[in-house]
Each structure stands twice: as C-alpha cells, then as structure tokens.
A protein has these predicted regions:
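Short, flexible coil/linker segments at domain boundaries that flank nucleotide/cofactor-interacting
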Residues: 2-6, 86
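The C-terminal output helix
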Residues: 129-142
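N-terminal pre-triad scaffold of radical SAM enzymes
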Residues: 12-16
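Cofactor-cradling patches in redox/metallo enzymes
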Residues: 23-128, 132
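A short, charged, Gly/Pro-tolerant segment at domain boundaries
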Residues: 140-150
Length: 150
C-alpha cells in the first residue's frame, strides 16, 4: 500500500562535531528520492533533536555522528523518544561507528547504522522499507553493520 504523504526525515548533527558535508549529502539524496527533509544543522542537543522531530511529525530521525560521542548521545535520544512516547520514529545512524559499539546501539533501538561510503540508494531504500512498518524502536530488524575501521 502506497503512502499518501511523503516520508518525513529529520537529519541532525548532534554534539560538537563540526563536519556536516555527509549529513547534507544524505539530506539531499533523501529529498531527491521524494522525502521531506528537515535538516537541523550543527551542534544539536538530544533534547533539541527530539523536540524538533515531534514538532515536525517525522517518520525517521537520521543522526550523523563523526565525533565518537555516539555512546553518550544515542542513548539519550532514545530515552527522550521513549519519554515522549515517540518510539515509533525510525532511528538511523550514520558516521564512523566502531564495530564493537554497533551491536549495543542496535540493541538499544537504532534500526540501522550506515558507515562512510554506504551507497545512498541503500539508505533511501532502508528508510522506505522500514518506515512503512513503524513500531517501537526495537521492532525493525537491525541492518547488519560493519565499519571500515579496525
């Protein structure tokens, strides 16, 4: 069954990371694929991200984290989504995430982790496929992740 409205995705750069080129490339690819994209800009707090996601009624949040702060930021975003009863928002992560951290992040509710060099079509198709089956954060079977970092 086709959606009657475009998928809405919030792309955010949490923490002190100042590199946003990748997030902007992802945002443009999602937009070009027909999705409505809200880009929050640099240095967003988890509170700002969740608040914007709820206000904008998004289907998906994409976090771009290159700073190494994923183990502090992502659990806070998930906790805030749960507090706001917004667990049906699909949560995906992009950036340089070590393999040893990926499994715990996915267990906690991240549906997919996309490392550097992931084809844009892979990201678009994952979001399209999984937004349709929105449910609690842990409902979507995690996409296998393997970083290109040792």
């Amino acid at each position: 069954m086709e959606r009657s409205t475009p998928i809405r995705v919030l792309v955010a750069k949490p923490g002190l990371d100042g590199h946003d080129r990748g997030a902007k490339i992802i945002a443009r690819a999602l937009r070009d694929a027909g999705m409505e994209v809200i880009y929050t800009g640099l240095r967003q707090t988890p509170e700002m991200i969740v608040s914007a996601a709820i206000q904008e009624d998004v289907d998906c949040i994409g976090l771009s984290i290159l700073s190494g702060a994923h183990n502090a930021i992502v659990p806070r975003v998930i906790a805030l989504l749960r507090e706001q009863q917004a667990e049906d928002i699909l949560l995906v992560l992009g950036g340089t995430i070590p393999n040893q951290d990926a499994e715990g992040l996915q267990r906690s509710g991240v549906s997919a982790i996309f490392g550097p060099g992931t084809p844009l079509d892979t990201i678009v198709e994952f979001i399209r496929r999984n937004v349709k089956s929105r449910g609690p954060l842990t409902r979507v079977a995690p996409l296998p992740y393997e970083s290109n970092r040792p």
